[in-house]
Amino acid sequence: MLQPKKTKFRKQFKGRISGAAKGGFELNFGQFGLKCLEPERITARQIEAARRAITREMKRQGRVWIRVFPDLPVTAKPTEVRMGSGKGAPEYWAARVHPGRIMFEVDGVAEDIAREALRLGAAKLPVRTRVIQRIAD
């Protein structure tokens, strides 16, 4: 699964996901992409599950690009622990995704296969998405 090799600080504030994506909202690599339509935190496990679903449907042909990276440590305290005594330990990694952000791109396969692969990948994610296609020049 994806996670940073090294971070400056172990823990971060929760923060909010406000506004539309400021970058990463255009197709840069592939012909088809999966665009996020609502703000959400997506975990590294969800990204990996979506990637596996996409590559399995494409039968390992073509190419898949992951355009989001989980760089936010999400902390949790153990169950049945009293309140207080500091913030919990980092439990997993997540990525903040703004509306309009391209999360996955695919290329090198037919349109129907690409759309079906991205649809199956979208089923693994907790956000509403849309499959987009590069306009032929």
Swiss-Prot record:
GO terms for biological process: translation. It comes from the Bacteria. InterPro entries: Ribosomal_uL16 (IPR047873), Ribosomal_uL16_bact-type (IPR000114), Ribosomal_uL16_CS (IPR020798), Ribosomal_uL16_dom (IPR016180), Ribosomal_uL16_sf (IPR036920). GO terms for cellular component: cytosolic large ribosomal subunit. Keywords: Ribonucleoprotein, Ribosomal protein, RNA-binding, rRNA-binding, tRNA-binding. Coiled coil: none annotated. GO terms for molecular function: rRNA binding; structural constituent of ribosome; tRNA binding. The keyword Transport does not apply. Pfam families: Ribosomal_L16. CDD domains: Ribosomal_L16_L10e (cd01433). Belongs to the universal ribosomal protein uL16 family. Part of the 50S ribosomal subunit. Binds 23S rRNA and is also seen to make contacts with the A and possibly P site tRNAs. This is Large ribosomal subunit protein uL16. It comes from Methylorubrum extorquens (strain PA1) (Methylobacterium extorquens). The lineage of its organism: Bacteria, Pseudomonadati, Pseudomonadota, Alphaproteobacteria, Hyphomicrobiales.
